[in-house]
């Protein structure tokens, strides 16, 4: 009987490996950005799209991916996504231009959108006892948080010995392991009442999210008040509003918008979105800060983010344990407040601040905050749904993470770019650089470093310092934006997130079908525990 019980945790291990692959690729590329910028002559805008090309398609297609899993079978869709992820990783590694790399990253995002919601949906169907499910979700969330920090470390280690393409090639053997183990261990499950696929809803959701993020990323180039930016954002919001209206008209919607009437579901989704907004924006900045401002090599930059992984791992189990005692509201609000305070510390960090001072303190506060936010909030989302709708619930949870993260990189990256660009142009012009040269330096911090190296020898130290200080100005401004967003999220969690699910909000699990294999597994596991 024990082996049957243990099998569920082996299933969880396979699901966590799949999650690790998907989430690591959100951040592993960040540490390679300076190298990619040099090799592919990529601007800051192109670097943002190398990051956002993945998260944009990932976020835009998550609802479709979750919906397909509910209809076709979650294990089948997960396996398809893993195979596609391996193939597109090879495509990214073979890219010769920034445009090719952006296209490959976008294709990887499509694969990730099939993988991510299936993992949480399968978990929800395997762990049917609420307390065990909360623990499993806590582990799943911890792996997601760890993967964010592991990405720069593993990327730095690879770049120490190989080219930037290695950060994509490394996915292939892990995909093979996940495919084989998944085939042997994972049970199949689906929603027997899924209904017909909604192609118009899929098109509207993808179009709305894509247009919104594109408009924000391009805002610094066009201007925040330009017709392109205002029209793009307005058009995106209109498309998303039409999507919401269309879903209310469908008998079998991709996303049942009535779920958002449940404050436990909607407030938890918002908390995750805003937490990842700040987190991904900061990771985008900090990996470049370690290499450009502090002069670390890629491995050193990756290792410098290691405290984030350690703190996340340390606090994730505690977050679930505390949530079981005091409820979701206090834990999630506390986590968001910790994140906000971490961003405030980051905003006061100077170029020469000791690493073991404000830098580590800022990262540790953010990591602890992430642990206290994501696990409990994810459990609140999944606990509000019947198991046959686990794919839809997982897709909402994953979409909020990816949309929040995508917009975080877009908005905070735009603030960073604007702050750095305006200050470096003024500073380098003051040192005698021609206006055209100064504006070229303002395109990216790597371009600024190269420009400073071409100044006369006597002025090179001053020019290099001007580039570093301008970049720090952008980091300060971006960190303050993240601090403000997570502070607002803290207040919203306290105001709207219930401490525990009320009876009227509990899912109708009795009516939810459970796969036969999972039902037997759960019964045998319960008997083994009683023994």
Features from the language model and the residues they span:
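Transmembrane-helix bundle of Major Facilitator Superfamily
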Residues: 1-184, 317-319, 326, 344-347, ...
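C-terminal membrane-cytosol helix-exit motif in multi-pass small-molecule transporters
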Residues: 172-190, 208-217, 236-250, 492-497
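A membrane-interface helix-boundary motif in multi-pass transporters
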Residues: 160-172, 218-228, 297, 418-483
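Flexible interhelical linker loops that connect adjacent transmembrane helices
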Residues: 2-4, 177-206, 248-263, 324-325, ...
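Interfacial helix-cap and linker-helix signal at transmembrane-aqueous boundaries
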Residues: 36-37, 68-69, 157-162, 216, ...
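C-terminal module of multi-pass small-molecule transporters
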Residues: 73-82, 95-99, 115-119, 126-138, ...
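Transmembrane-helix exit segments and adjacent C-terminal regions of multi-pass membrane proteins
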Residues: 1-19, 242-245, 264, 368-370, ...
């Amino acid at each position: 009987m024990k082996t049957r019980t243990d099998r569920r945790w082996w299933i969880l291990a396979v699901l966590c490996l799949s999650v690790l692959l998907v989430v690591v690729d959100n951040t592993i590329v960040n540490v390679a950005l300076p190298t990619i910028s040099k090799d592919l002559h990529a601007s800051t805008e192109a670097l943002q799209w190398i990051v956002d090309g993945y998260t944009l398609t990932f976020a835009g297609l998550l609802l479709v991916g979750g919906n397909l899993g509910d209809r076709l079978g979650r294990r089948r869709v997960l396996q398809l996504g893993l195979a596609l992820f391996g193939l597109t990783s090879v495509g990214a590694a073979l890219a010769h231009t920034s445009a090719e790399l952006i296209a490959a990253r976008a294709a990887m995002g499509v694969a990730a959108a099939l993988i991510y919601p299936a993992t949480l949906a399968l978990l929800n169907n395997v762990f049917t006892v609420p307390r065990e499910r909360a623990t499993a979700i806590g582990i799943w969330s911890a792996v997601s948080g760890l993967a964010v920090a592991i990405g720069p470390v593993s990327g730095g280690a690879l770049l120490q010995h190989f080219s930037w393409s290695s950060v994509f090639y490394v996915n292939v053997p892990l995909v093979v392991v996940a495919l084989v183990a998944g085939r042997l261990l994972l049970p199949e499950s689906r929603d027997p009442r899924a209904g017909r696929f909604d192609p118009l809803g899929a098109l509207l959701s993808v179009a709305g999210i894509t247009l919104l993020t594109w408009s924000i990323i391009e805002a610094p180039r066009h201007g925040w008040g330009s017709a392109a930016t205002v029209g793009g954002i307005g058009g995106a919001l209109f498309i998303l509003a039409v999507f919401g209206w269309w879903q209310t008209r469908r008998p079998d919607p991709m996303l049942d918008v009535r779920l958002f009437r449940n404050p436990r579901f909607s407030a938890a989704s918002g908390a995750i979105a805003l937490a990842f907004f700040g987190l991904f924006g900061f990771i985008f900045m900090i990996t470049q800060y370690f290499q450009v401002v502090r002069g670390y090599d890629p491995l050193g930059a990756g290792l410098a983010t290691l405290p984030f992984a350690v703190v996340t791992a340390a606090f994730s189990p505690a977050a679930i344990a505390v949530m079981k005692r005091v409820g979701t509201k206090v834990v999630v609000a506390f986590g968001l407040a910790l994140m906000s305070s971490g961003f405030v510390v980051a905003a006061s960090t100077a170029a020469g601040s000791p690493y073991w001072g404000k830098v580590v303190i800022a990262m540790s506060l953010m990591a602890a905050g992430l642990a206290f936010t994501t696990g409990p909030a994810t459990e609140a989302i999944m606990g509000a749904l019947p198991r046959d709708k686990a794919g839809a619930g997982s897709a909402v949870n994953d979409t909020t993470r990816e949309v929040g993260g995508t917009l975080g990189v877009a908005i905070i990256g735009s603030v960073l770019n604007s702050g750095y660009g305006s200050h470096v142009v003024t500073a380098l012009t003051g040192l005698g650089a021609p206006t055209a040269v100064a504006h070229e330096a303002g395109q990216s911090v790597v371009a600024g470093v190269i420009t400073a190296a071409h100044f006369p020898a006597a002025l090179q130290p001053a020019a290099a310092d001007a580039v570093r200080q301008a970049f720090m100005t952008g980091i300060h401004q971006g960190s303050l934006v993240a601090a403000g967003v997570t502070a607002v999220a803290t207040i919203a969690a306290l105001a709207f997130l219930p401490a525990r699910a009320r009876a009227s909000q509990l899912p109708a699990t009795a009516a939810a079908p459970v796969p036969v294999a999972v039902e037997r597994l759960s019964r045998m596991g319960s008997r083994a525990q009683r023994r």
